Regions:
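N-terminal core-binding DNA-recognition domain of tyrosine recombinases/integrases
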Residues: 6-25, 31-160, 190-197
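Conserved tyrosine-mediated DNA breakage-rejoining catalytic core shared by Y-recombinases
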Residues: 225-273
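Catalytic-site neighborhood detector that most strongly recognizes the C-terminal catalytic loop/helix
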Residues: 360-390
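Active-site/catalytic core of tyrosine-dependent DNA strand-transfer enzymes
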Residues: 266-323
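Short, charged phosphate-coordinating catalytic segments
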Residues: 131-136, 213-238
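DNA breakage-rejoining catalytic core of tyrosine-based enzymes
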Residues: 153-188, 249-268, 286-290
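Short, basic (Lys/Arg/His-rich) helix/loop patches that form interaction surfaces
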Residues: 194-196, 310-358, 362-366
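Basic, Lys/Arg- and aromatic-enriched nucleic-acid-binding interface segment
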Residues: 185-220
Length: 402
């Protein structure tokens, strides 16, 4: 982004605080939307010199436009051009018209989570930009501007739909057992239901990718960031490492673990499949005369990109029972399976959450593991509540169900 303040924020604030390149890119895209919706924000210096900040009208326009897809965002002050109706028929189908309007609406607007994140990143940038100006002020002028900036931030916060992160209501769910059976059968290279073309390398590679994600839990970027040197064939252990701004990674969207490193022990079946893939990988690289340190590669010998993982998921969604599958759902499935197995074995909930943090690469302060254990954590409380209800609200004709 060719902008002084955005670049200064990215380099001086985000980069120094440990943000990865992909995270910085995401936040800068949000700032680009801010500039598009409110062109005045691309050069706030004249306004700041007058001691002014964003107005309520401008802020309302920004919040409205953040609901739109990037290409549909309208600059402040521009009139939104009406859509001229086609005059092909005097009589039109009401159902067809409703369908077109619904499609147009869906194509133009983003979901609530996307808007929330956009707003969050823009608030972060505007807060930083205001702070940069505040440090140059003194006395009453400083206090007045700080109050104005705080009011705008509070206004944005009050008018932004919040995402409910309470683990009691948002515990993520993975594939159920029946869906997992369908998935594992479909990715078998010899299965007649295998959705990928009859190429041994592609089928074995895709099977390994899915198995790693659903059986050990790494994110999509974590799998793509694995190097061949991260696997120790003697111990059967695999490292998932975060290599921020890796100079050897030339992919447009850099990969790697989102958080810190984690060490995964693989069982015999996964080790066997991994070694089978390594043999095919070596033959392909020799044939293509290519070299890459990354484990998962394309049929051309290049490091596989995230878009290819998305293609793998799209192929699987064509299979009945797997219509809603996506990369992160496999991580949810792994975590849900891990918790269910540990609870069945009598492992303490606190220990399960600690194990999830270690294996899943979450920080010690992360509450994400509690989203997976919440259903089991509150099960005893729900049981006691039902017992109390039965005691205090007896049935008129109490009968034991057959």
């Amino acid at each position: 982004m060719p902008d002084y303040w955005a670049n200064r924020w990215a380099v001086g604030r985000l980069r120094t605080s440990g943000h990865a390149a992909n995270s910085i890119s995401t936040k800068l895209r949000a700032v680009a939307l801010l500039y598009k919706a409110l062109p005045v924000t691309s050069d706030l210096t004249p306004r700041l010199a007058r001691g002014e900040w964003l107005t309520v009208v401008e802020t309302d326009h920004l919040l409205q436009q953040l609901s739109r897809r990037a290409e549909a965002v309208q600059p402040y002050g521009d009139a939104i051009a009406p859509i001229a109706p086609k005059r092909e028929h005097k009589v039109v189908s009401l159902e067809n018209m409703r369908s077109k309007l619904t499609t147009r609406h869906d194509e133009e607007f983003v979901d609530t989570n996307t808007k929330f994140l956009r707003t969050l990143f823009i608030r972060e940038f505007l807060g930083w930009r205001a702070d940069q100006h505040i440090v140059s002020l003194r006395g009453a002028t400083k206090a007045a501007f700080a109050e104005a900036a705080a009011q705008v931030d509070a206004y944005i916060d009050d008018h932004t739909a919040k995402i409910n992160n309470d683990p009691r209501f948002t515990n993520p769910k993975g594939l159920d057992e029946a869906q997992q059976d369908v998935l594992l059968e479909a990715i078998n290279p010899d299965s007649p239901n295998n959705p990928w073309k009859n190429d041994r390398f592609i089928r074995v590679r895709n099977q390994l990718v899915v198995q790693l994600m659903v059986a050990t839990g790494p994110r999509r970027g974590g799998v793509l960031g694995i190097r061949t040197s991260d696997f120790d064939p003697l111990t059967g252990r695999l490292q998932i490492v975060r290599r921020k701004d890796d100079p050897e990674d030339s992919r447009p969207v850099q990969t790697g673990n989102k958080k810190g490193a984690c060490l995964i022990s693989l069982d015999y079946g996964l080790i066997k499949n991994l070694k089978t893939y390594l043999v095919l990988r070596h033959k392909l690289l020799v044939h293509k005369r290519r070299q890459t340190p990354y484990l998962i590669i394309s049929s051309k010998g290049d490091a596989l990109e995230q878009s290819s993982i998305n293609y793998i998921m799209r192929s699987l969604r064509a299979i009945p029972g797997l219509e809603g599958i996506h990369p992160h759902l496999l991580r949810h499935t792994w975590a849900s399976n891990f918790v269910a197995d540990a609870v069945a074995k009598g492992v303490d909930i606190a220990m399960i959450e600690e194990d999830l943090r270690w294996l899943g690469g979450w920080s010690k302060r992360s509450d994400m593991p509690s989203h997976y254990t919440s259903a089991y954590r509150h099960r005893s409380a729900e049981k006691r509540s039902l017992e109390l209800q039965e005691k205090l609200v007896p049935l008129v004709n109490p009968r034991k169900p057959k």
